[in-house]
């Protein structure tokens, strides 16, 4: 009987260790997960982020290249996007809305490297820029 209890205990320990090892290979629940930046959904979110940045600007910025994307599942989804920007051809005026199709880059020179976190709750039609920060390209 003692042998049987020892064998059952040993099997339980092995199964627990195997389950723990497989969990460690998966993304941490609530942690950031790296995504493929070539997905058009992420590029659209980056354009959304730049469209909200109008204070103190005469022209909208526009996205040149999406560099990195991470997602985090919360009570919705947080998207952390890192991208390069430059000034666009669209002047910020009352009634003029940003569009990635219309607001083309004035030049292809990178003016800033920006990181933005966008919070979405698709089933409630919520989309908000939580943070937006840019650095000069040589500071990154």
From Swiss-Prot:
Report what the protein is called.
Mialostatin
Q: In which tissues is it expressed?
A: Expressed in midgut (at protein level).
**Miscellaneous information on this protein:** Decreases symptoms in mouse model of mannan-induced psoriasis-like inflammation by modulating immune responses.
Triggers of expression:
Up-regulated following blood feeding.
Instruction: Specify the domain of life of the species encoding this protein.
Output: Eukaryota
* Gene Ontology molecular function: cysteine-type endopeptidase inhibitor activity
- InterPro entries in UniProt: Cystatin_dom (IPR000010), Cystatin_sf (IPR046350)
An annotated GO cellular component of this protein is: extracellular space
Organism encoding this protein: Ixodes ricinus (Common tick)
């Amino acid at each position: 009987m003692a042998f049987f209890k020892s064998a059952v205990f040993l099997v339980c320990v092995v199964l627990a260790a195997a389950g723990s090892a497989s969990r460690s290979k998966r993304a941490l629940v609530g942690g950031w997960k790296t995504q493929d930046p070539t997905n058009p959904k992420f590029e659209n979110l980056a354009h959304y982020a730049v469209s909200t940045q109008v204070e103190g600007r005469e022209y909208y910025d526009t996205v040149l290249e999406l560099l990195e994307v991470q997602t985090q599942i919360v009570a919705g989804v947080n998207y952390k996007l890192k991208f390069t920007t430059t000034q666009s051809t669209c002047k910020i005026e009352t009634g003029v809305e940003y569009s990635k199709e219309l607001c083309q880059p004035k030049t292809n020179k990178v003016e800033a490297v920006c990181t933005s976190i966008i919070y979405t709750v698709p089933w409630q039609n919520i989309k908000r820029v939580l943070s937006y920060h840019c650095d000069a390209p040589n500071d990154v």
